């Protein structure tokens, strides 16, 4: 039997750039796969997380989010900025994104390896910096999003993601919801359908009248 959320999926998209070379991007990809597997295996999330790769340029950002908009199964995107300043690749084309957005402003590690930390580690693990810049640019673009507080392995953080997923699923389901209004005015007339038209543009639901107000 299909469960309520089986028809949906949430994409996981990692932001990076080629400033530190291909080896860094390979490491970013490995960390991203580790996080996605951990989130799916946690048992806390109602919707499956699907890793959609690392985006390293504005063209890749645009292509990925355009694909998300056109995929009926995708109800939202989890963004994670792994390296230094991936948000520079987010431009005006990102403003057309229709999917729900959440971001994980935390490094893949839960602690800091003080004994072994070097510049390679510092250059690679800059989520705190990258996600702050991402938050800055999407705020300037007036894009609403959920910011998850806490490490991705923490139960509290996973519960935040789960709640966001449920809201995103409800919104997606409402886009083709049929609402029947009783005792309404004339149907399919621009003037009398004004309120119904407003509701449709606001929540995406189809307002339909079956029983007229005249008795």
Task: Give short role names for the model-derived ranges.
Residues 1-215:
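Metallocofactor- and cofactor-centric catalytic cores in central/energy metabolism, strongly enriched
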């Amino acid at each position: 039997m299909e469960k309520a959320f089986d028809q949906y999926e949430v994409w996981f998209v990692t932001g990076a750039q080629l400033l530190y070379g291909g080896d860094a991007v390979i490491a970013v990809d490995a960390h991203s796969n580790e996080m996605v597997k951990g989130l799916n295996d946690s048992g806390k999330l109602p919707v499956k997380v699907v890793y959609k790769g690392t985006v390293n340029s504005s063209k890749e950002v645009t292509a990925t989010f355009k694909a998300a908009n056109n995929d009926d199964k995708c109800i939202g995107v989890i963004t994670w900025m792994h390296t230094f300043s991936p948000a520079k690749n987010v431009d005006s084309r990102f403003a057309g994104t229709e999917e729900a957005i959440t971001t994980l402003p935390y490094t893949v590690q839960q602690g800091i390896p003080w004994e072994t930390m070097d510049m390679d580690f510092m250059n690679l693990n800059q989520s705190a910096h990258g996600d702050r810049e991402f938050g800055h640019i999407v705020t300037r673009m007036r894009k609403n999003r959920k910011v998850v507080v806490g490490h991705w392995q923490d139960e509290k953080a996973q519960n935040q993601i789960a709640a966001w997923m449920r809201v995103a699923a409800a919104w997606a389901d409402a886009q083709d919801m049929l609402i029947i209004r009783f005792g309404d005015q004339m149907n399919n007339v621009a003037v009398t359908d004004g309120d119904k038209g407003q509701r449709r543009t606001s929540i995406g639901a189809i307002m339909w009248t079956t029983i007229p107000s005249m008795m």
